[in-house]
Amino acid sequence: MLRQVPRTLVAGGSALAVAVGVLVAPLATGAAAAPTYNYAEALQKSMFFYQAQRSGDLPADFPVSWRGDSGLTDGADVGKDLTGGWYDAGDHVKFGFPMAFSATMLAWGAIESPTGYSKAGSLDELKDNLRFVSDYFVKAHTAPNELYVQVGDGEADHKWWGPAEVMTMARPSHKISASCPGSDVAAETAAALASSAIVLKGDDPAYAATLVSHAKQLYTFADTYRGAYSDCVTAASAYYKSWSGYQDELVWGAYWLYKATGDATYLAKAEAEYDKLGTENQSTTRSYKWTIAWDNKQFGTYALLAMETGKQKYVDDANRWLDYWTVGVNGQKVPYSPGGQAVLDSWGALRYAANTSFVALVYSDWMTDATRKARYHDFGVRQINYALGDNPRSSSYVVGFGANPPTAPHHRTAHGSWLDSITTPAQSRHVLYGALVGGPGSPNDAYTDSRQDYVANEVATDYNAGFTSALARLVEEYGGTPLASFPTPEQPDGDQLFVEAMLNQPPSGTFTEVKAMIRNQSAFPARSLKNAKVRYWFTTDGFAASDVTLSANYSECGAQSGKGVSAGGTLGYVELSCVGQDIHPGGQSQHRREIQFRLTGPAGWNPANDPSYTGLTQTALAKASAITLYDGSTLVWGKEPTGTTTDTTPPTTPGTPVATGVTTVGASLSWAASTDAGSGVAGYELYRVQGTTQTLVGTTTAAAYILRDLTPGTAYSYVVKAKDVAGNVSAASAAVTFTTDTTGETEPPTTPGTPVASAVTSTGATLAWAPSTGDPAVSGYDVLRVQGTTTTVVAQTTVPTVTLSGLTPSTAYTYAVRAKNVAGDVSALSAPVTFTTAAPPVDTVAPTVPGTPVASNVATTGATLTWTASTDSGGSGLAGYEVLRVSGTTQTLVASPTTATVALAGLTPATAYSYVVRAKDGAGNVSAVSSPVTFTTLPVTSTPSCTVVYSTNSWNVGFTGSVKITNTGTTPLTWTLGFAFPSGQQVTQGWSATWSQTGTTVTATGLSWNATLQPGQSTDIGFNGSHPGTNTNPASFTVNGEVCG
């Protein structure tokens, strides 16, 4: 459940990304040491967590066995398909802002540490998770300047505690647009799509190109129509308000687009916007006392731009931030617990430490400063190890991993309640493998595993994002072993759909009266029962089945009436219908339906021999397996009688099992099927034989079973028994005995055929080869580039062909291929293939001249220019524009937009300006300049007309202050805010303005992007502060010295 206060209450950043092409130094440790923890298993399980968070239509073979389809009507309220995406946390709202941040962080981790994912056997799962969420973002981007950023309502969602599959509350869709801007979420979604495109490009270049196209549009949207999304989408403001503003996302999004496209214009944009990022209070020093999380990404951009450009100002900002987390800055340092946990904030403390750890590890790889390199590396390893169990409690904070892990995460679907109750059942019904909980919220290492504690035990997609990427980095350095049979499908914890019944009164000679209760406690996965039917079976005792009539005194499923139906011989039944009722595990009344019904027959009717009468009492409701329950025509509970004769004959004995595919940890068993002439074979029970002891290891409905998690070099014996529908069990089969391998499969696959190159272009080619064979089966191929004596894996595929991309024109390439089988054995390398890429096409044609610019939104310090777009026929495509200021005979470059519009800022009031524009293509050809546009900025207004709205969120001796300034006048307003604290409060850090405090007087001045407000326009600014125990609001506020209403 998301709290109703912000998770991050500072100006600062939260979004990480790594650039393709950044050269990094070798890992901090020259030779990988044995890992303290099995990082590969933790990474593998973290991928499971993201799968468990999926919304929408899930495939039949989905690895999370207890999840089903959900949210299938998302977007229907606005006529759009908004199915898919991730549920945010333990609730079921799809918040686009943290979802996009989480995707970007995961993509960064894949770009930085693909080998870590490969070693953990999780690269396919990572790509699948990124593609799944990218598909959702593409759906949500319904027009160039339109993006749906939230589905569901937090307040309504949090009032209900049940599984996602059976939600019934309204799920409204919320969007941003040109008239309702959201630069923060639009730029973050652009970053998510651009970074994901980098990861997915090698597998599907066309799909990656689609993601980049959407990312470009979204970034232009974010840059052109500026504003914080939570100002317009107020449904998000109580949960994921953009406290830091959108400046950080403009840097972050531009950087990622640069890495995805190679277009240096985006890098220049990132650097230009960087200079407007938040600073420490009353200082020009970039903020460093917080960290990267869903709201603010500036801390991640410190490291990214440092690694990309090497410029000292970025290096200084990154070092200062990470020093604050490690050794301290100017005597101040993030708080540490006695056990070594870095605790920045009470809500999701482990999340903040994990995010910082990932950046620290990546940044340390790049550094040449030996002291800081070791410091940041060791900090990252230490914080991740703390979460995995290296803490005073010797306990993991990752569900389903390590020693004493959390068992009660604050997660509705994993809990599996059918009563809309956070406490029932007491134990969670599912294991939410891989979920990182919030952990200790104070620097004292204290923690209680309680589902009701939605601070310490909350889980969320953004909690796992940096943590997952850090795990991939540690697997790359230290290794690890993924679990061979993970995940294992969970088995139902009892009856999911059933009928309870009792007698309402003693039977008479003409009727039987029964109280029946249909219950839906399903969670494997949860499901709605909308076509429920119940059959009560009776014997005819010499009369016709139609002589029995059905009636009901009380029914929660509507009127019940009818006559008995013959089932053949002396068997009949009456059917009660709940068709049209939504019986689902969603509450006390929602999960059940009660019917009190009566069967009336001829005089002298004896109910004692009726199959459904067996076991009924007058004392209490009890499960009645002889009263059958159906979903439509499908039997979901109970056993249908087979006439008046009871089946007491067991099935025939199964054949002796045969073991095949024996590996170090598993084997496949199969046997000749049993037969049963009575109620029919229901399935088989497999037993391990150890001396005179037989231990049940599993059941199956097929005459085969796959054994997993065996011990290498160990002898095993098994027998099989058959069981029929009536419950009769056959004799055991003869035993099969085999010994698992000690070193795995000794026969690798055959060597693949020599690759053949085709479709060779200047930047790519297709390779195909004759497939390998072997037993066990071939699972895939590694494609390796050969450079002298060095070979490097550049692609992996499950089919004998691969498409290469991103090659250099006019360059010779050599590749070879090797095969792998399911046991991990690798074949010899194939013979190599060598080919040379084609020369690049030459573009010498300049774009057409742009149209004459048109000035609009002219203010005191800014204006907007638009012009008719250029076209380019030379082949390299239009890359962007250069906007030049004209002063006499001098032309000065002032902006390089990628679209036919630019917002000018920092102009002087009451001053004439002239500008021209020229276009530039991908080959560097430049058009002639356009005709000039001339305009004069407005003079500064001296009498502002405004309103100020002030609100706070307080805790202990701290608080967050939020201020909305609105220009209610008719002319532009360049503002300076002033007020006085009445209770000794102090501003400690602010954002979206330059803050200062002298005594009790506080002053805030606008930044370049929000300093001037047009008529009717608003800006949100804010700060963190301290108070002595009383936090009285200021009496009044001034703008430019005048009292503001």
Swiss-Prot record:
Keywords: Carbohydrate metabolism, Cellulose degradation, Disulfide bond, Glycosidase, Hydrolase, Polysaccharide degradation, Repeat, Signal
Signal peptide: 1-33
GO molecular function, one term: cellulose binding
Domain of life: Bacteria
Chain positions covered by the region annotation Catalytic: 34-492
Location of the CBM2 domain: 939-1045
Listed InterPro entries: 6-hairpin_glycosidase_sf, 6hp_glycosidase-like_sf, CBD2, CBM2/CBM3_carb-bd_dom_sf, CBM2_carb-bd_dom_sf, CBM2_CS, CBM3, CBM3_sf
Group of enzyme by EC: hydrolase
Annotated EC: 3.2.1.4
CBM3 domain location: 493-642
Residue numbers spanned by region Linker ('hinge') (Pro-Thr box): 644-650, 734-748, 831-846, 931-944
Domain Fibronectin type-III span(s) in chain numbering: 653-743, 751-840, 849-940
GO biological process: cellulose catabolic process
Chain ranges passing through the membrane: none
SUPFAM superfamilies in UniProt: Carbohydrate-binding domain (SSF49384), Fibronectin type III (SSF49265), Six-hairpin glycosidases (SSF48208)
Catalytic activity: Endohydrolysis of (1->4)-beta-D-glucosidic linkages in cellulose, lichenin and cereal beta-D-glucans
Note on domains (UniProt): The linker region (also termed 'hinge') may be a potential site for proteolysis.
Name the record gives this protein: Endoglucanase B
Upper lineage: Bacteria, Bacillati, Actinomycetota, Actinomycetes, Micrococcales
Name of the gene this protein is made from: cenB
